Amino acid sequence: MASLKSLLSGFLLLAGAAQALKFDLEATSSHHSNQRRCIRNFVNKDTLVVVTATLDGYKGDGMNVNMHISDSHGNEYGKAKDIAGEQRIVFTSHHDAAFDVCFENYLTGSKYVENPRRHVELDIDIGADAKDWSAIQATEKLKPLETDLRRIEELVGEVVNEMDYLRAREQKLRDTNESTNNRVKWFGMATTFLLIALWGWQIMYLRAYFRSKHLI
């Protein structure tokens, strides 16, 4: 039993080994899309996502930080304006798609800012990692080992779903490639046939021309 617990703990530690992304967000005096700082991630359809951003500073410090989440299909998952401290946005994805978590930092002009930047710590939890397992354990009255097994089961299921998605995408790309090759083949054959027909027509035309001139 002890070895099983150690194995489960090691697996969960490996699965949750991703650390928070930390960066400094410099403030600007104008609003331009190219001054956004965006972090992109991929998520499968109907997957729970929890985005947690922790910023230093405070409201009214002369900077205004906005956060915006959207995916490549144009779905809007959340907006938060003038954030400071911890900000959390929870959503469920609508498509198999990449989503962007974007930040903007603008100077408000209300006061002088000596060091116009905010430090951001960003956590993005997806799928099983986004669930509150302590609450699940309490609600369903699970033992710690049962909770770990449940979490591992969901993590493995996510890996299987990801592999199925990649396999389906590979098959789609293969079908597209084969379709393109067939089109190129038929286009090449049609081009060759047209060139042969044009060559034959030119010979017949020249023969008729020379006969009309009594050259042959």
Curated annotation (Swiss-Prot):
Residues 207-216 are cytoplasmic. Residues 1-20 form the signal peptide. Residues 21-185 are lumenal. InterPro entries: Emp24-like, GOLD_dom. The chain crosses the membrane at residues 186-206. One of its GO terms (biological process) is intracellular protein transport. Residues 36-126 form the GOLD domain. It is a single-pass type I membrane protein. Pfam families: EMP24_GP25L. One of its GO terms (cellular component) is endoplasmic reticulum-Golgi intermediate compartment. Keywords: Endoplasmic reticulum, ER-Golgi transport, Golgi apparatus, Membrane, Protein transport, Signal, Transmembrane, Transmembrane helix, Transport. It is found in: Endoplasmic reticulum membrane; Golgi apparatus membrane. Belongs to the EMP24/GP25L family. PANTHER family: TRANSMEMBRANE EMP24 DOMAIN-CONTAINING PROTEIN. Constituent of COPII-coated endoplasmic reticulum-derived transport vesicles. Required for efficient transport of a subset of secretory proteins to the Golgi. Facilitates retrograde transport from the Golgi to the endoplasmic reticulum. This is Endoplasmic reticulum vesicle protein 25. It comes from Neurospora crassa (strain ATCC 24698 / 74-OR23-1A / CBS 708.71 / DSM 1257 / FGSC 987). The lineage of its organism: Eukaryota, Fungi, Dikarya, Ascomycota, Pezizomycotina.
